[in-house]
C-alpha cells in the first residue's frame, strides 16, 4: 500500500466531503513543481486558485515568515504591531487608495466589502430603508452566507436558506441589464473583472468601463473583486486595468499572502472606509504581524521579478500555442495573461485526470472548462512542456 493511498484513506475517513480533489497527495513544492510522497514530480498549473502567483515556497517570502515568526506572530488588534503599517503602506501605494482594512481570507474580505457598502449607503449616501447591492450571474465571491446569497449556483445555496436579502443579480456582461437594475437604493456593484470559477469568462469590451461610469452617475460604489484575477494573474497588476478603470474599492486576497500565509483586505478612499468606528468590524487575526510581514515580501516579489509583465508575455505565447490545437471538441480557448480556460464540449474532469498521469496538475471549473493558471514564475520552456502534455491529451487520437 502506498503512502499516497494511506494519506487519502485517512483524509477521506475523517474529513467532511466538501471537496472532490484529484487523487494525488502533495508533500513538497518549489516554484512550479510539486512532489508526492513517492517522489513523483508534477507541474502545478492551478497555483491554489491563483494564491501561489509567486511560486511555491519562494525563498524571500519564506525568509520573511521565518524572521517574523522568531519575533512576534499575533497581538490582536487590541494593540499596534510594527508590521501592519508597512503592509498598509504597500497596499495603498499599489492601489492608489487612502485606507486599508485587513482580514484573513478572501471570503472575509468580501463580507467586509458588503458591510462597508451597506454602512456607506446609510451614513454617506443617505439611502433610506434597505440598501441593495448588484452582483452578476456566474459570480464566485466565496462560501460565507453573504457570498452564497449573491451566488447563482443552486448547489452553493442548497440547504443553507434563508438566504440574506439585499442582493440583485444581473447577467454578467449585460450593461443594459445593469443600468436597468440601478435604483435609488443601490449601494454598490460588486464584480469580478474576469470570472474565474465561471470558466475564465471575460466580459465584452467596454462593459466594465461603462459600468464604472454608471456607478459614478448614480453615486454607486464600484467594487472590484480581484481576489483571483488580481496581483499579476491577468498580465496586469489588476484585471480591471484592462479597461483602464479605477474602482472605488478593491477586494484582495489569495496571492496577497504569496501562498504562504492567509491575508486579505479591502482598499478604498477615506470617505468610504471611515464609516467604520471601533467595535463596528474586526478580526482577531486580521492584520497580524506574521501575515503583514509575509504580504510585504509577497508584493515585493511580484514587483521585483516583474511578474505581471511576465504573465502578460508568457500568457500571450501560451494561448497562441493552445489555440493551435485542432480538435472540434475544443469550443474555446480564452484568457488574459496566465489566467486561461480551455472550454470543451464535454466534461473536463477526465482530461484533468489524464493530464495528471502526464505530470501536469490542473482542475476543471464549471464542468466543461480546464483552468490553466500556473505560478507566474513559470518559464517558457516549462510552458512548452505543459503544452506537449495538453496537446497529447486533447489530440483526437487520444480521445478516441
Swiss-Prot record:
GO terms for biological process: L-proline biosynthetic process. CDD domains: OAT_like (cd00610). It is found in: Cytoplasm. It holds the Pfam family Aminotran_3. It is an enzyme of class 2 (transferase). Its EC number is 2.6.1.13. The keyword Flavoprotein does not apply. InterPro entries: Aminotrans_3 (IPR005814), Aminotrans_3_PPA_site (IPR049704), Class-III_PLP-dep_AT (IPR050103), Orn_aminotrans (IPR010164), Ornith_aminotrans_bact (IPR034757), PyrdxlP-dep_Trfase (IPR015424), PyrdxlP-dep_Trfase_major (IPR015421), PyrdxlP-dep_Trfase_small (IPR015422). This is Ornithine aminotransferase. It comes from Exiguobacterium sp. (strain ATCC BAA-1283 / AT1b). The lineage of its organism: Bacteria, Bacillati, Bacillota, Bacilli, Bacillales. The gene is rocD.
